[in-house]
């Protein structure tokens, strides 16, 4: 099993798809890496030679910020927004949508499941 950037890539998948299992690498970046290193995108991970694995590993480590480093950077960016008191930081702190989406209805992904609030009780008729 090929281990790149601390991730075990699935053996049966094509390299092009397997690289997307690494946080920070999508399909476009995966194709870009393979083109630069000269590895065929159709090769299965189990058929990669040690030399190809090492070239992929080096290309990713030198060029891109992936996995833990990228997660830390994203977290620090969000923390910075909160610390400077930016509106976006405030939305992150409150757990609401950050990019201007409506919140009267929807926004359930950010807000979590509905919390039922006891409303007004109906008056009984006599």
UniProtKB/Swiss-Prot annotation:
Keyword Ribosomal protein: yes
Pfam family, one: Ribosomal_S13
GO biological process, one term: translation
Keywords tagged on the record: Ribonucleoprotein, Ribosomal protein, RNA-binding, rRNA-binding, tRNA-binding
Record-annotated membrane-spanning stretches: none
Record's GO cellular component terms: cytosol; small ribosomal subunit
Ranges for region Disordered: 92-126
PROSITE patterns: RIBOSOMAL_S13_1, RIBOSOMAL_S13_2
Gene3D superfamilies to which the protein is assigned, alphabetical: 1.10.8.50, 30s ribosomal protein s13, domain 2
InterPro entries: Rbsml_uS13_C, Ribosomal_uS13, Ribosomal_uS13-like_H2TH, Ribosomal_uS13_bac-type, Ribosomal_uS13_CS
Superkingdom classification of source: Bacteria
GO molecular function: rRNA binding; structural constituent of ribosome; tRNA binding
PANTHER family the UniProt entry points to: 30S RIBOSOMAL PROTEIN S13/40S RIBOSOMAL PROTEIN S18, SMALL RIBOSOMAL SUBUNIT PROTEIN US13M
Function of the protein: Located at the top of the head of the 30S subunit, it contacts several helices of the 16S rRNA. In the 70S ribosome it contacts the 23S rRNA (bridge B1a) and protein L5 of the 50S subunit (bridge B1b), connecting the 2 subunits; these bridges are implicated in subunit movement. Contacts the tRNAs in the A and P-sites.
Complexes and interactors: Part of the 30S ribosomal subunit. Forms a loose heterodimer with protein S19. Forms two bridges to the 50S subunit in the 70S ribosome.
Entry's family note: Belongs to the universal ribosomal protein uS13 family.
Name recorded for this polypeptide: Small ribosomal subunit protein uS13
